[in-house]
Regions:
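AMP-forming adenylation/ATP pyrophosphatase catalytic core
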Residues: 1-147
Length: 147
């Protein structure tokens, strides 16, 4: 029993919706990058688009703040990020506990990083410092699709 869920069986990771991510992989921008059971699709638009936040597997970020070198990895001890809407950074572990992400799933949640810094906890929240604003000139769209 974890956060009001009953998990039967000896391997609760088998019920995890995220494929295991091994190591750290660079994302092609723009393009499609296959990563551990995911197809990560990226594109850049020169104007601000209507940001649709209904799909948690799609993020819209300020492309100029993100740069051209992003990676995907799982969490490591000491990770911090500034969740959208927060004024200060938060420990990733505390963020996951607060959202009641099952402990056995936390190692598998994909993280998009820039220079080792988490900028998107896929399926949950982007980093506030990389959000699209009125001053954004180019928008980076990143979409994770299961394969």
């Amino acid at each position: 029993v974890e956060y009001g869920r009953y998990l039967l069986g000896s391997d609760t990771k088998a019920l995890c919706p995220y494929p295991e991510i091994i190591g750290e992989s660079e994302i092609k921008i723009p393009g499609v990058t296959p990563i551990s059971g995911w197809a990560v699709e990226t594109s850049i638009t020169e104007k601000v688009v209507d940001v649709d936040n209904r799909n948690e597997f799609v993020a819209y970020l300020d492309a100029d703040k993100c740069g051209r070198s992003l990676t995907v990895r799982s969490r490591i001890d000491g990770d911090h990020f500034q969740p959208l809407g927060f004024d200060t950074p938060k420990r990733l572990n505390r963020f996951m506990i607060d959202l009641k992400i099952p402990q056995t799933w936390r190692e598998r949640v994909p993280l998009v990083c820039r220079d080792g810094q988490v900028i998107w906890v896929v399926d949950y929240r982007i980093d506030d410092r990389y959000k699209v604003t009125a001053d954004t000139k180019r928008v980076l769209k990143i979409e994770f699709k299961r394969v």
